[in-house]
């Protein structure tokens, strides 16, 4: 992954961690599972918590920023209620130029 996409991915990860801290555990400490995997020409970033669940993408600044950053990656983000907890999965191409080949 190139440096620009890595920075964008880091910003998304940071915002997902902040959101989990704020909403899943109401500002208290709690466990998070973070995985980054690769398959073919795509990567998948997953952030999951064991919090109260039921929370999804909001309409606040952080959620809007995540949406904008995901668009920059030409990716897709999915929210899945684990009851309890939430799993957020981001998928995108590692190298978007591979579409042009």
Regions found by a protein language model. Give the residues of each.
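Conserved short strand/loop->alpha-helix "switch" segment adjacent to the catalytic nucleotide/phosphoryl-transfer site
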Residues: 1-17, 21-31
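C-terminal end segment of the histidine kinase catalytic
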Residues: 90-101
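Short beta-strand element(s) in the Bergerat
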Residues: 41-45, 86
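Acidic ATP/Mg2+-coordinating residue in the GHKL
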Residues: 49
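ATP phosphate-binding glycine-rich loop and adjacent ATP-lid/helix-beta elements
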Residues: 55-81
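Glycine-rich nucleotide-binding loop
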Residues: 31, 53, 82-89
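Short beta-strand/loop element within the Bergerat-fold HATPase_c
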Residues: 31-41
